[in-house]
Amino acid sequence: MAGHSKWANIQHRKGRQDAKRGKIFTKMAKDIILAAKGGGDPAMNPSLRLAISKAKAVNMPNDKIDTAIKKGTGELAGGDISEVMYEGYGPGGVAILVEAATDNKNRTVAEVRHALGKGGGSMGEAGCVAWMFDKKGVMVFDAEKYTEDQLLEIGLEAGAEDVIAEDESLEVHCMPEDFSEVQKAFEAAECEAKSSDLAFVPKNLVEVDVPTAKKLMNLMEKLEDNDDVQNVHVNADFPDELMAEMED
């Protein structure tokens, strides 16, 4: 979909900010704990394999990874957290999905509602905006290293749905249930992705002007400052001039 690469760049920028704020290991540990509830062997649990891969990509120490796995399987205390999804609206009527991992849902919902309200948005009812997004496996490749045809040839046989070209990136999309096999196909072909994750991809993007986009970015950052918030997804088409500022 046109404009999605800008959305992906927002995700990448957020990851850098998480690392700067020292929050990245906390978020990764929660991902691993939740994934390990489905089994502690990454060879048999694709979700855990993905969570471990993401943790290693940000240099999370092996002992912290092992501890998180044991919390998820129940071998250690501290794994009593659950996944929650909140839906709402941001500045300009942009749809917002907030993924959280929490041991206290009442606390988290109150804090997310407060952040949304203070940032010019509002909390919505369950289902109000989720239909505007599709959960997809998304792998992002450098367009200078690979061609669209090359990625299609490798990916389609493994279950990839599409390759989307925009700017300097090529994105391979697939259904979540095919994600593990698609990843394996590219690894076997020695095609290295810049990023690889399950994400809520907007079906359509809403254009916003620069002032609205900046308000939205501030709101997203406030939400992500919450220790319980794992990911924030929006359906905004961020202006090119704002993206240029972010790269400076």
Swiss-Prot record:
One of its GO terms (cellular component) is cytosol. It is found in: Cytoplasm. One of its GO terms (biological process) is regulation of DNA-templated transcription. Keywords: Cytoplasm, DNA-binding, Transcription, Transcription regulation. Residues 1-21 are annotated as: Disordered. InterPro entries: Integrase-like_N, TACO1_YebC-like_2nd/3rd_dom, TACO1_YebC_N, Transcrip_reg_TACO1-like, Transcrip_reg_TACO1-like_dom3, YebC-like. SUPFAM superfamilies: YebC-like. GO terms for molecular function: DNA binding. Belongs to the TACO1 family. This is Probable transcriptional regulatory protein Desal_2886.
